[in-house]
Every structure is written in C-alpha cells, then in structure tokens.
C-alpha cells in the first residue's frame, strides 16, 4: 500500500518539530516529510523514524529568503553557489535518513524570463549529476505562487521529456486544480512521470472532504496507471491536525482494496 505521508511543516505545527513524527504515527500516518528539517540532526531523525516505523518521503533544498518571498533558488541567476550548497546539504541529509527525494524549488526570479530558464536548466542538470549513485532522485513541482518559475504542469511535463525522465514530478492536487486541470485526468495521463503526490482539497487547501475534489477518482487514476509511491498530505488543517486526519482509516481501506483487487 502507498505510504501516507504527513507534511509536518503544515501539520502538527502546535508541537515542537521533534514531537511531530510521533504525533503523525499515532494518527495513522506511515511517513513524514518536511522541507527544512535541519533543526533535527540526521542521526536523531533517523532514530525517530526507526523507533516509530516511519519513512521520510521528501525534503526541499535551497528555499532562499522566505522574508523576500524567494521560494527557492534554482532559477535565481547569480545565486548558483548558494543553490549548490543548499542542495548538497539536503542531499547529505536525505542519504543519511533514507529519504528518496530532494526537491530543489525553482523560486520567484526577479530578472528576465530567459535568464531564469537558462539558470534553472543548468542548476537542474547539476543537481541531477550530483544525485547519481546516491539512491536519491530529484523532484520538480509546478507551484501556483505568483511569479514562481515552474508554474505550469505542461512545462514540467515538457521538461521531464527533455531530460529523458531523469527526475520525477511532484504532483499536487491543489495546485493542479488552481491551474484548471482535472487532477484525476492529469494523473492518469502522467502517472509514469510522478514520484510523489501532495493532497489538499480545493477550494481552501484544507484536508480531504472540505472541498470539491473527488479523491476516489484521483486515487483510482493513480492506482490504475501504476503509481506506488508515497501520498503526501500538504494541507492547512481546518481543525486540530488529529481531528483533520479522521479520513485516514477510510483512505487506508480504499487503498488496501485497490491493491488487492
């Protein structure tokens, strides 16, 4: 069955970072993820994961200056040295804790579009060479933040083809819907490209069941087209996190039925 991954940057934020993995395990999640878990040294994180029977799904590299709304460094011309240092830090952490993916966020470039595109391609190429032999793969995600360089699922898929599938896509149901895509249809057509999934309902970006998305269709599309990776929950809880996760038993039953059918 697919691992169900709690994004502990969004969930359990009332708790210290070190206490969030245990809370996720108690509520029935089988994996966790966080963009910048550096406050917990890799040795401590690995021990926590082993004790709780969890895996770590994906980590982000090079977020840049959050106060300036950079949202990543990969497409920011002139920041290549900082990008590489951040990527190496994330890759080392991922290898140490057995995490399969690093997501180098593209960011919100301030310069020309062509310069940003060239910088992004060069940084992505460098990152792909860096992960060779590590057991870790690179993720690329289309994100609907205004000005974000990788803001199109079509562009992400095109880039995936141009790089001959050397990285995987992070598919987010909320962002897909904002981009006027049918998440189930897109997942069916592109499942071979997907390495990780993020779940949030739309509108509102809250837990499943609070919006209009037909998650049964989305899960069926992923299942029928061979997706076996983790399903991450990157939503803003509309209630306390544990209460918001009440859907988990039903999702586990659904996924178990689909796997056994």
Predicted regions and their residues:
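Hydrophobic anchor at the start of a short beta-strand
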Residues: 4, 32, 56, 138, ...
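Short, contiguous strand/loop micro-motifs
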Residues: 7-8, 31-33, 76-79, 113-115, ...
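Active-site acidic/histidine proton-transfer and metal-coordination neighborhood
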Residues: 73-168, 258-260
């Amino acid at each position: 069955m697919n691992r169900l991954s709690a994004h502990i940057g969004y969930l359990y934020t009332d708790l210290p970072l070190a206490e969030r993995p245990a809370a996720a395990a108690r509520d029935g999640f089988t994996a966790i993820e966080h963009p910048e878990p550096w406050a917990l040294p890799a040795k401590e994180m690995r021990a926590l994961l082993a004790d709780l029977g969890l895996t770590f799904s994906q980590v982000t590299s090079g977020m840049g200056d959050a106060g300036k709304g950079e949202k990543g460094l990969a497409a920011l011309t002139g920041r290549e040295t900082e990008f590489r240092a951040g990527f190496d830090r994330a890759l080392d952490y991922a290898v140490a804790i057995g995490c399969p993916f690093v997501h180098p966020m593209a960011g919100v470039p301030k310069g020309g579009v062509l310069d940003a595109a060239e910088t992004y391609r060069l940084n992505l190429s460098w990152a792909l060479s860096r992960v060779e032999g590590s057991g870790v793969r690179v993720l690329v995600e289309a994100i609907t933040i205004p000005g974000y360089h990788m803001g199109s699922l079509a562009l992400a898929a095109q880039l995936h083809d141009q790089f001959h599938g050397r990285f995987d896509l992070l598919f987010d149901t909320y962002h897909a819907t904002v981009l006027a895509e049918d998440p189930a249809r897109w997942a069916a057509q592109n499942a071979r490209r997907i390495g990780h999934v993020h779940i949030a309902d739309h509108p509102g970006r809250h837990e499943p069941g609070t919006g209009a998305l037909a998650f049964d269709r989305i899960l069926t599309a992923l299942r029928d087209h061979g997706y076996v990776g983790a399903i991450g929950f990157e939503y803003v809880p509309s209630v306390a996190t544990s209460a918001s996760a009440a859907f988990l038993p039903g999702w586990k039953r659904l996924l178990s039925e689909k796997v056994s059918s």
